[in-house]
Amino acid sequence: MVMPSSSESTFRVFNEIGIISQLANNAFESCLPDGLTVSQFSVLNWFIRVDVEATPGRLAAAFMVTKGAMTNTLKRLAEKGFVDVRPDENSGRRKLVTITADGQRVRLAALKAVEPLLEEVLTQFNSAQISACLPFLEQLRAFLDLRRSV
């Protein structure tokens, strides 16, 4: 048996992660309440994980999307009452975005709605298997996050 080269193995890892991402996002989105998309949920989740307030530009940079794409996502979230977009009092042009109580509620509802999917995953893979891959995935994410400006 011929062993794959290191670069082939690395490519296979990235390929698998990409496919898993597509499949997981589709499965996750089918569980989301209130017509929420994965992109919208991700923005709500960012406010819980990272910071309570941000400019649209900061969010666009964090998600590596255009300002226009982020503005569209924020507009849809604001229409649903899940974020508040208001002028920055210290700037005539900038806006500040925060998650609302309804946004926090729908985020929690989304996490609750995805529990059956997560439980189904645990019927195929035990928690030790899942926990074992986390350190590598976290390190890879951190490495790629540091490189994003390169």
Predicted features and spans:
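Charged, amphipathic alpha-helical coiled-coil/dimerization segments
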Residues: 75-135
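Base-recognition residues in the alpha-helical recognition helix of bacterial helix-turn-helix
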Residues: 15, 42-46, 71-73
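C-terminal regulatory/oligomerization modules of transcriptional regulators
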Residues: 1-8, 128-150
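Alpha-helical linker/hinge and terminal dimerization helices associated
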Residues: 17-20, 24-28, 63, 106-125, ...
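Residues within helix-turn-helix
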Residues: 56-57, 68, 75, 95
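N-terminal leader segment of winged-helix/HTH proteins
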Residues: 1-34, 80
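N-terminal helix-turn-helix DNA-binding core of bacterial DNA-binding proteins
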Residues: 26-66
